[in-house]
Design a protein with these regions (language model features):
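AAA+ P-loop ATPase motor domain of ring mechanoenzymes
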Residues: 62-115, 119-122, 261-270
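Interdomain "pre-motor" coupling segment immediately N-terminal to P-loop NTPase/helicase cores
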Residues: 28-88
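Solvent-exposed alpha-helical segments within well-ordered globular domains of core cellular machineries
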Residues: 25, 29-32, 41-45, 59-63, ...
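Conserved P-loop
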Residues: 103-181, 281
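Intrinsically disordered, low-complexity and often Lys/Arg-enriched segments
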Residues: 1-29, 267-282
Length: 282
C-alpha cells in the first residue's frame, strides 16, 4: 500500500468506493476544521499502517492523535523558547562542573527538575565574572521552558531601561504585569553597574509582585552585603533581599573564568596546529 501524505489522496492499494472516498475526504475536512493539521496530513500514512499492521480502529486513532499531540507540544515549546529570549544555547547538560570549584552537582541537578518552581523558590547565583553564572541561569530557564513553564530571561539593565520607558510612556502597570506573569523570571548581571534610584525602585517592585508567587533566578557579581551600594539605597536593598532570600537557594560560584579558559584553550590549539608543539600558556 502506498501513500502520499502531502496530498489529499487516500491510500491506493485498492480502489475505494465513492462513498468510502467521500468519508475519507470528510474525515480530513473534519480534522482540518478542528485545526488538527498534523493529523490531517498524516491520515493517509496512518491508514496505510493500520492496514499493513492489522491495527484496530482504536489503535490507529491513538497513533494519529499521538502525532498531533507531539506536533502541538513541539509548537508550544518553540513558542515558549521564543518568548523566553534566551541569549545563548547553553543548557545545564553542557555545563563544565569540573571547572566550577565547590559547585554542588546534585543541587543543580535538582534545580534542573524545576520542582523549585512549585514552591516559588528563588535561585541566587553569586560569583565573579566568567565563572558560569549566566550559563546556569540560561540552563535553568531552558529547563523551565521545556518543562512547560512560561519563562522570561532579561538583564537587570534591560529590565531597568524597559521600566523607565514604561513610566515615561504611561505603561507602568502593563509592564509590571508583564514581569509578574512568567512562572520563572531570570534576571542576569545585577551589580555590574550601579542602578539609578528609579531603576532600583522598579526592580524592587518586580521582586515584590512575584514574592511567594513565582520564582526568580538572579545572577550577581556582588555579595548581598554590597547590594545597598548597587541599588543606591540600603533600605530598598534590605527590603528586596528580605523577599528574595525568604524562600531561596543561594549558590556561590568560584574558580577560573570560563572565558579565560576558552581563550587559553584556543591559544593552545593554535600553537599545536601551527608549531606542532605544546607550550605553556601565561
Amino acid at each position: 500500500m502506498t501513500t502520499n501524505p502531502g496530498t489529499d489522496n487516500p491510500p491506493v492499494d485498492r480502489p475505494l468506493t465513492a462513498a468510502a472516498a467521500t468519508r475519507y475526504q470528510q474525515l480530513r475536512g473534519h480534522l482540518a476544521a478542528l485545526r488538527l493539521h498534523t493529523a490531517a496530513e498524516q491520515l493517509p500514512a496512518v491508514l496505510d499502517q493500520a492496514a499493513s499492521e492489522g491495527l484496530s480502529v482504536t489503535a490507529a486513532l491513538e497513533r494519529l492523535l499521538a502525532l498531533e499531540v507531539d506536533a502541538t507540544e513541539a509548537r508550544r515549546l518553540a513558542g515558549r523558547l521564543r518568548f523566553a529570549c534566551l541569549p545563548t544555547p547553553a543548557s545545564l547538560e553542557d555545563f563544565d562542573f569540573d571547572a566550577a570549584a565547590g559547585l554542588d552537582r546534585q543541587l543543580v541537578a535538582e534545580l534542573g527538575t524545576c520542582r523549585y518552581l512549585e514552591s516559588a523558590t528563588n535561585v541566587i547565583l553569586i560569583g565573579p565574572p566568567g565563572v558560569g553564572k549566566t550559563h546556569i541561569a540560561v540552563g535553568l530557564a531552558r529547563a523551565s521552558a521545556h518543562a512547560g513553564y512560561r519563562t522570561y530571561f532579561t538583564t537587570a539593565a534591560d529590565l531597568a531601561a524597559r521600566c523607565h520607558r514604561a513610566a515615561i510612556e504611561g505603561r507602568w502597570a502593563t509592564t509590571m504585569r508583564f514581569y509578574a506573569g512568567p512562572t520563572l523570571l531570570a534576571i542576569d548581571e545585577l551589580g555590574y553597574l550601579p542602578l539609578p534610584a528609579e531603576a532600583a525602585s522598579a526592580l524592587f517592585q518586580v521582586v515584590s509582585q512575584r514574592y511567594l508567587k513565582t520564582s526568580i533566578v538572579l545572577t550577581t557579581n556582588r555579595g548581598v552585603g554590597a547590594w545597598g551600594e548597587i541599588l543606591g539605597d540600603t533600605t530598598v536593598a534590605a527590603a528586596m533581599l528580605d523577599r528574595l532570600l525568604h524562600r531561596s537557594v543561594v549558590i556561590n560560584l568560584d574558580g577560573d573564568s570560563y572565558r579565560l579558559r576558552d581563550h587559553h584553550a584556543r591559544n593552545e590549539q593554535l600553537r599545536r596546529t601551527t608549531t606542532g608543539t605544546r607550550q605553556p600558556i601565561h
